């Protein structure tokens, strides 16, 4: 631009003074044009800087966030987080209710006159356990029972227990009376036991043994080295107005029953248990018919499964407070079982012999005389279900004669399971 302006000026050939003024004016004009060009060139850069400065606050964090998200934690930090999560998971939470169920379905057919063969629904049992603190726990057992016209719900056990240590545990509630072995080893839930039913002397709803007990119980181990001694001692309500039931709502007299059980589990002979029990109560049948009751029992058990050996003996003494008349009843059973080594050890044949005698002088019980042989087979369908089949040969004494008559043969089948 400067060269063009100068060429134009020199082509006009004005006077010298005028030429100097024109050159000065042209130079000033060129200087103004250069400033203008510089300003115009500076505007896009300023606009881009302004735009970048406006958008930078919102856009800048994105790469940082992405970088932080993609950046892995150090190994020791990850291990620390995992350890903390594991500790939180392992920490106990109270209360922590757990529920387990048992059920069974049965079939029976006998040659006893006046009875019908067919299926029946066994007990539906729920076990509920909850820790309330590191040393306090609660346990409940409820059953749903089928009857000809309806169902009944029974609270079989309801126990709150405080564990001071292994040598002393105290509890209150409704128990299975710790007499002998079977009554506290196998509770409601037929899957728990080898056979279909309990022995007659400890059957649910029976009268020979007080199955349930309402009151207080202390139990624990006894320091005895390898002998493995343990005890349980309880005080509570005895038999109720219906002697097959305890005094759930209160005792029917002012005399408390007590029970004591002592047994050993030698460490060197795992599966072996032997011991004895004693029970004392006052039975009130109404009308001034009160009786002192003494029960003593002993048991010898081997539970390794190959073989299984269960045996119990129980003696019941009743003395009339009014007349002093005494009656003595006896009962025992022996059960043998062997888990076969074939078919993944799922087959277990067993045999049980039962004997029960009540004298004619016995007025607390009805006639309970019994001699029974049971041949059975248990097949464990899975770890939580079993199929059982039994043949029973039963003889009961007829009241009019001193000999055992009333022989009954029967086939019994059951499928039982836990869930």
Where do the PLM segments sit?
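Bacterial N-terminal signal peptides
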Residues: 1-7
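N-terminal periplasmic/intermembrane-space "pro-region" immediately following the signal or transit peptide
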Residues: 10-104, 419
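A general secondary-structure boundary signal
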Residues: 20, 30-45, 127, 137-141, ...
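Outer membrane beta-barrel
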Residues: 85-241, 254-259, 263-270, 333-339, ...
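A generic structural micro-feature
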Residues: 93, 118, 152, 208, ...
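Outer-membrane beta-barrel pore domains
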Residues: 113, 158-163, 171-174, 190-191, ...
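Short helix-to-loop capping/linker segments positioned immediately adjacent to catalytic or ligand/cofactor-binding
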Residues: 203-206, 220, 246-250, 264, ...
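Active-site-proximal beta-alpha loop/turn segments in soluble metabolic enzymes
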Residues: 234-249, 281-283
């Amino acid at each position: 631009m400067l060269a063009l302006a100068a060429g134009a000026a020199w082509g006009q050939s004005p006077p010298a003074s005028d030429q100097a003024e024109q050159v000065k004016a042209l130079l000033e004009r060129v200087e103004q044009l250069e400033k203008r060009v510089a300003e115009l060139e500076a505007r896009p850069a300023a606009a881009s800087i302004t735009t970048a400065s406006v958008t930078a606050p919102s856009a800048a964090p994105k790469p940082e966030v992405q970088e932080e998200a993609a950046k892995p934690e150090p190994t020791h930090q990850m291990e620390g987080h995992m350890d903390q999560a594991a500790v939180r998971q392992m920490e106990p939470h109270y209360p922590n209710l757990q529920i387990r169920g048992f059920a069974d379905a049965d079939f029976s057919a006998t040659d006893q006159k006046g009875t019908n063969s067919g299926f029946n629904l066994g007990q539906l049992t729920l076990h509920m356990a909850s820790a309330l603190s590191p040393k306090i726990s609660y346990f409940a057992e409820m059953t749903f029972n089928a009857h000809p016209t309806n169902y009944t719900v029974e609270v079989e056990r309801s126990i709150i227990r405080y564990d001071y240590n292994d040598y002393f545990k105290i509890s209150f509630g409704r128990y299975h009376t710790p007499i002998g072995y079977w009554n506290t080893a196998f509770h409601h839930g037929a899957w728990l036991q080898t056979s279909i039913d309990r022995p007659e002397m400890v059957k649910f709803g029976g009268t020979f043994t007080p199955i349930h007990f309402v009151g207080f119980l202390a139990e624990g181990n006894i320091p005895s080295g390898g002998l493995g001694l343990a005890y349980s001692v309880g005080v509570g309500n005895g038999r109720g107005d219906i002697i097959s039931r305890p005094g759930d709502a209160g005792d029917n007299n002012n005399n408390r029953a007590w029970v004591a059980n002592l047994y050993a589990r030698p460490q060197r002979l795992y599966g072996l248990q032997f011991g004895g029990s004693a029970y004392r109560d006052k039975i009130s049948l109404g009308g001034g018919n009160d009786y002192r009751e003494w029960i003593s029992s002993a048991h010898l058990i081997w539970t390794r499964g190959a073989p299984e050996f269960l045996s119990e003996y129980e003696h019941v003494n009743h003395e009339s407070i009014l007349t002093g008349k005494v009656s003595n009843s006896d009962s025992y059973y022996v059960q043998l079982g062997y888990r076969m080594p074939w078919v993944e050890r799922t087959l277990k044949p067993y045999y049980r012999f039962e004997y029960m005698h009540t004298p004619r002088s016995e007025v607390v019980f009805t006639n309970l005389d019994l001699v029974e042989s049971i041949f059975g087979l248990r097949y464990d369908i899975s770890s939580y279900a079993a199929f059982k089949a039994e043949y029973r040969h039963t003889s009961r004494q007829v009241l009019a004669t001193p000999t055992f008559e009333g022989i009954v043969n029967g086939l019994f089948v059951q499928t039982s399971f836990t869930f």
